């Protein structure tokens, strides 16, 4: 830490102006420390980040915590470095905030290894261009919305359709099957949800393989605009230094953009369309471009995307779409049928649902499943008005198979065992493809629909029917 000391000259909400001696201005993105007794009794407990040089030896900074209690003339220490996060084993099983301080009440976190949160994206020469499928063990995702290793997937869904459970199951499967690390970034989410997630992960035993980095709705915009970068830094350490395949969950990526918009006007920038910051694309790009596969390891991202007023043309979701490799859409109609995970098989898309990446057989089966379900959807109006008896024999077979496929897309989850009483199942991709192929080929037309509900592989369905 340098011995450069400045003083507070102006406070405007989350934005603080600090004056330094001539020739001693800290660089942009440098972390400065102020002691704010309103937060707690610790020294240097408020971190502010340099955003602009205003002239007259004054820098404009964004606060990472509340600025209530700051007064003009307060001393400000220059750390000479950006905000840093504790990385490696120290971050696992813990809940940290944007500046790497623990918020779980379990004592201090070792800062033996730290990394700055602002880092360049990997160079083109370091990036891995081969496309590999990341097996999640969740049938509907592996079959119809395959995740590219090192890719970015968007998870779209309203409240109560199962986003969190799918996330937790993925954390569990990556930890159990791949021995992988997961990082969860809670960006501007409800504190209650963050608390629930922590306790559920603790109870299901996946917490030791995960790092939770939270910046909830109550935090100032500075923290919410940086917490995704803090979490990504933890993930990058596991990828670049330990050569791991890491999964990062960001809930919610919209709040990252929203926080940037909140501080943008205070920094004197002219707002862009719909009041967003003019730097929207570059802010989001700086985060998204760091999420990639390199020759050392990979970071695969699952991002929850809130769509304001269901308007997909809003600049925030529209800019996010440009970065995504695929979208998993969760449907309330499917959840109402009791089918979980409630992924909409006709609305969800993946860039790598292509024979060149997943193989001819997988591609053919996936498309056949979608065609059967689409035909069933088209026939539903006729069935509702005239009943099943008016359908042709061919259509009756299609409807019966579609209903079996629909039920077979459900699956018992490990993390939901406590609620359902059913043991969870992890299904390998080859078993998933084979199972769905057998249903499409009519091999199991004699089994009742109920046999396909909440089972793993097709063998479990056959055993359930014999039951």
From Swiss-Prot:
SUPFAM superfamilies: C-terminal domain of alpha and beta subunits of F1 ATP synthase (SSF47917), N-terminal domain of alpha and beta subunits of F1 ATP synthase (SSF50615), P-loop containing nucleoside triphosphate hydrolases (SSF52540). The keyword Transport applies. CDD domains: ATP-synt_F1_beta_C, ATP-synt_F1_beta_N, F1-ATPase_beta_CD. It is a peripheral membrane protein. It catalyses: ATP + H2O + 4 H(+)(in) = ADP + phosphate + 5 H(+)(out). Its EC number is 7.1.2.2. The keyword Membrane applies. Keywords: ATP synthesis, ATP-binding, Cell inner membrane, Cell membrane, CF(1), Hydrogen ion transport, Ion transport, Membrane, Nucleotide-binding, Translocase, Transport. PANTHER family: ATP SYNTHASE, ATP SYNTHASE SUBUNIT BETA, MITOCHONDRIAL. Belongs to the ATPase alpha/beta chains family. NCBIfam families: atpD. This is ATP synthase subunit beta. It comes from Desulfosudis oleivorans (strain DSM 6200 / JCM 39069 / Hxd3). The gene is atpD.
């Amino acid at each position: 830490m340098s011995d450069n000391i400045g003083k507070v000259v102006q406070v405007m909400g989350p934005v603080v102006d600090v004056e330094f001696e001539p020739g001693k201005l800290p660089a942009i993105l440098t972390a400065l420390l102020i002691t704010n007794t309103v937060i707690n009794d610790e020294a240097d407990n408020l971190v502010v980040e340099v955003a602009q040089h205003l002239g007259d030896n004054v820098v404009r900074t964004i606060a990472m915590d509340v600025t209530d209690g700051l007064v003009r003339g307060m001393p400000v220490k220059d750390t000479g470095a950006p905000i840093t996060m504790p990385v490696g084993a120290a971050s696992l099983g813990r809940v940290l905030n944007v500046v790497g301080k623990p918020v779980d009440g379990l004592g201090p976190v070792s800062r033996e290894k730290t990394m700055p949160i602002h880092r360049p994206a990997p160079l083109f020469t370091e990036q891995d261009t081969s496309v590999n499928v990341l097996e999640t063990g969740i049938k509907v995702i592996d079959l119809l919305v395959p995740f590219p290793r090192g890719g970015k997937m968007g998870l779209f869904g309203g409240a109560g359709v199962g986003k969190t459970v799918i996330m937790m199951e993925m954390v569990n499967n990556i930890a159990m099957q791949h021995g992988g690390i997961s990082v969860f970034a809670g960006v501007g989410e409800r504190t209650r949800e963050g608390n629930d997630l922590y306790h559920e992960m603790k109870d299901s035993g996946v917490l030791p393989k995960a790092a939770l980095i939270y910046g909830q709705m109550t935090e100032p915009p500075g923290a919410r605009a940086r917490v995704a970068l803090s979490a990504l830094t933890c993930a990058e350490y596991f990828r670049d230094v330990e050569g791991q395949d890491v999964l990062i969950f960001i809930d919610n990526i919209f709040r990252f953009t929203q926080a940037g918009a909140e501080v943008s006007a205070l920094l004197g920038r002219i707002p862009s369309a719909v009041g967003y910051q003019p730097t929207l694309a570059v802010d989001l790009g700086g985060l998204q471009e760091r999420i990639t596969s390199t020759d050392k390891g990979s970071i695969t991202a699952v991002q929850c995307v809130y769509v304001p007023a269901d308007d997909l043309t809003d600049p925030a979701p529209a800019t996010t779409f440009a970065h995504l490799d695929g979208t998993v859409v969760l449907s309330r109609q499917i959840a109402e049928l009791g089918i979980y995970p409630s992924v909409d098989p006709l609305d969800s898309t993946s860039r790598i649902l292509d024979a060149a990446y997943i193989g001819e057989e997988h591609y053919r089966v996936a498309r056949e499943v979608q065609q059967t379900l689409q035909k069933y959807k088209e026939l539903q109006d006729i069935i509702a008005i005239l009943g099943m008896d008016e359908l042709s024999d061919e259509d009756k077979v299609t409807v019966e198979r579609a209903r079996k496929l629909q039920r077979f897309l459900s699956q018992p989850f490990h993390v939901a065992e406590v609620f359902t009483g059913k043991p969870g199942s992890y299904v390998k991709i080859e078993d998933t493809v084979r199972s769905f192929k057998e249903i499409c080929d009519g091999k199991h037309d004699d089994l009742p629909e109920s046999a396909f509900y909440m089972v793993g592989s097709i063998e479990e369905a056959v055993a359930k029917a014999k039951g």
